[in-house]
Amino acid sequence: LLWNGRRNRDEKNLEHNSKFQQMIRKLLVLLLCLTAATATAKKPKSSASKKAESSAEKPKESDYDKLFKEKHTVADGMFRLHDVKGKLYFEIPDSLFGREMLLGSTISEVSDNAAATTGSKSDYPLQVVFTRNDRSVQLRTVNCENITDETGASRALAEAVKRNTADPILRNYKIEAWNRDSTAVVVNVTDLFVADVEEMSPFSKYGLYTAFELKKTFQKERSMLGEIKAFSDNVVVRSTLSYIFTLTRGRTTLVKDQPLTAVMTRSLVLLPREPYRPRITDSRMSVFPTGKVLFSEREQRAKVIYYAHRWRLEPSDMDAWKRGERVAPKKQIVFYVDDGFPEMWKKHIFEAVDQWNEPFGRIGFKNAIAAKPYPKDDPEFDPDNIKYSCIRYAPIAIANAMGPSWVDPRSGEILNASVYVYHDVMKLLNNWLFVQTAQADERVRAVTIPEEVIGDGLRYVVAHEVGHCLGYMHNMSASAVIPVDSLRSPSFTQKYGTTTSIMDYARFNYVARPGDR
């Protein structure tokens, strides 16, 4: 019995040990499986796995990078300009929203100079401002004709005028992207520069075709973006615009579906933050005006006032100027002379500008105005940029010259002025000299008038147009103060001329008779 009992205990122990060993074996198998799984996890990842993981970790491409990831033309300045496959994008910084600008258009090339003249500005520039909301950027034309008297108008009156003369929206552009540091927005402005914008049309109101009824159709497929430039206070965009046009007069069609292509240079110029102090015109002085309607509580009516057009001519040394000394201005008035003029003309054109230094000297300025050749080594110079005032040669059979100017509408300050001298001005001078002076001057009794005579006539014409550029209107009363018999006196005419103002239309001395000198 004892042996049987021991045997039973031994059998139970063996059974227990066997179960324990089986459990150990299972644990070992499980451990081996885990080790194998870990080893498998540490194996090099497949290329597909790497791509998936890289894609997950790579930051999302921004709208800005998507727009400009391909190679394209960029111009940096007041705005950053991007030309992407013929589309023009403006990158407008936050600091320039709300700043007033001038948008002007100049004709750089044209296929038909009867429609417009190279170098001319077909219309007045637009005063514009950029505004924005969260979704879009608005290009607005500034409504500044109605003003209030700062000292005599209440805030309520000023707000009422503002509400009733809000700035209209010329264009509304979707915000395409923000730049990388979120300080500027990007908009596509192609439709402002490669489109038919009536306010910037290449068909000049001074062209020969204004005598006819003109119907034009813009040809988008033949139009394209050109050169872009950007500077610290302006940007320049050149584009080629194509049209077909028809000319009629009454029931007669003179030209039908005639093609025209013009290269236009558009300048967007930042206006000074603080406008020049306006000066109210004096009716006794013939100066060009900019009209305003003044609303004031001190007046019992809306009052029309006029700001005089004038250059910002300020003494460089105010104390010396007040003592009566002649001083140079802080900024000289400069006219750049077109290098396309016939060589014989140039000398007389430079003299025409320089002679204006005499009247400026009488008000205390020396070297107030100058004529200079087109600069060869200035990368910023562009005669079609409204920053530069020029005297332009127009090879067209028009017997005339003209001197328009552009002003800051807020103050009347002249910002740009150009003289256009048409080729047949020489024909006009030839006719004037022969008809008006041949009876007393045998030198003009010829098919070709000597340079000393016709050159002096050209100087007179250009000086008259420069006077317009300085803000002066015609003064038809100037010659009325000179008695007729004085016009036959050599001593008088050599000292005083034939009129008291070059802005008169007193061409030449047609009162002189044979024998007078």
Model-derived regions: residue spans:
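Sec-dependent signal peptide recognition
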Residues: 24-30
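Auxiliary tRNA-acceptor-end handling modules of aminoacyl-tRNA synthetases
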Residues: 43-341, 359, 374-450, 458
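Zn2+-dependent metallopeptidase catalytic core
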Residues: 97, 340-368
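Active-site recognition of the HExxH zinc-binding catalytic motif
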Residues: 356-357, 460-475
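Conserved catalytic/binding loops enriched for acidic/polar residues
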Residues: 479-517
